[in-house]
């Protein structure tokens, strides 16, 4: 089998990035054909462009226009991006709540969504979307739940739902856009075609440990209770493994075709 070059972006604020980075590296290392380079943001555009696939776990990372164009062109050129949890989040803390500014349209249109809010962390149920029940990414996955951040987002372009939950109501005063009155599916996992390539987005994966809230403006010296998120669920790891396999498919298909 061919060598497969992955670029892993793990960085940002208010999450246990070290934990997520380690867990994702362990999963990537299960395949001896995969070689990984790691960054905290999108600044190493040369390494990103040279990779076979991209995987990310970030929160409130703000790429430049040039960096956004590089990741857009990376996917549009036929490659795949497995984006996790807060990759689609940028935040601005103001007196009336946390705003999610629409200042990064290229990034959000490439990802297919932008995070806007989440209710308080508590368990929520997740099911495979009926139209996707035979898709290899989710086939055979039984209904499950996780105690995590239930993402409320706006969407861009073509979206292929894979997994969903439901939420209606007020997500809480912490976020400026907190009124979500429509009782409709909230996507937990979806595919988003971009040119010749595709993005797979999977929203669970919150994790917070002792020192993760020290970043301003929150500046909490020590967080009192660890928040473990979906990482405690075997189903979460099963889906991560499937997502990584999905991301490798174009490279392996090209090698097989000679």
Can you name each region flagged by the protein language model?
Residues 13-14, 61, 88-90, 166-169, ...:
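Short, solvent-exposed loop/turn segments at secondary-structure junctions
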Residues 29, 35-37, 49-50, 119-207:
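Catalytic beta-strand/loop cores that center a nucleophilic Ser/Cys/Thr
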Residues 107, 111-113, 143-159, 195, ...:
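Oxidoreductase and adenylate-handling cofactor-binding alpha/beta cores
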């Amino acid at each position: 089998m061919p060598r497969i070059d992955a670029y892993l972006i793990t960085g940002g604020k208010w999450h246990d990035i070290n934990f997520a980075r380690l867990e994702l590296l362990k999963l990537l290392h299960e395949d001896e054909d995969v070689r990984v380079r790691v960054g905290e943001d999108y600044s190493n555009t040369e390494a990103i462009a040279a990779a076979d696939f991209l995987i990310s776990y970030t929160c409130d990372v703000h790429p430049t226009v040039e960096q956004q164009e590089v990741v857009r062109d990376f996917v549009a050129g036929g490659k795949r991006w497995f984006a996790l949890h807060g990759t689609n989040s940028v935040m601005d803390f103001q007196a009336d709540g946390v705003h999610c500014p629409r200042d990064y349209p290229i990034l959000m249109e490439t990802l297919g969504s932008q995070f806007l809010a989440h209710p308080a962390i508590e368990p929520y149920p997740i099911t495979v979307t009926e139209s996707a029940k035979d898709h290899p990414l989710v086939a055979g996955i039984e209904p499950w739940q996780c105690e995590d951040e239930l993402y409320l987002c706006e969407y861009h372009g073509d979206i292929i739902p894979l997994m969903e939950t439901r939420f209606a109501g007020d997500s809480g005063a912490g976020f400026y856009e907190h009124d979500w009155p429509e009782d409709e599916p909230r996507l937990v996992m979806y595919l988003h075609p971009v040119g010749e390539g595709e993005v797979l987005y999977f929203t669970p994966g919150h994790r917070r440990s002792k020192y993760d809230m020290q970043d301003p403006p929150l500046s909490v010296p020590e967080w009192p209770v660890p928040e473990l998120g979906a990482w405690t669920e075997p189903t979460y790891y099963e889906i991560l493994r499937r997502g990584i396999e999905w991301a490798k498919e174009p490279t392996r298909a090209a090698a097989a075709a000679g």
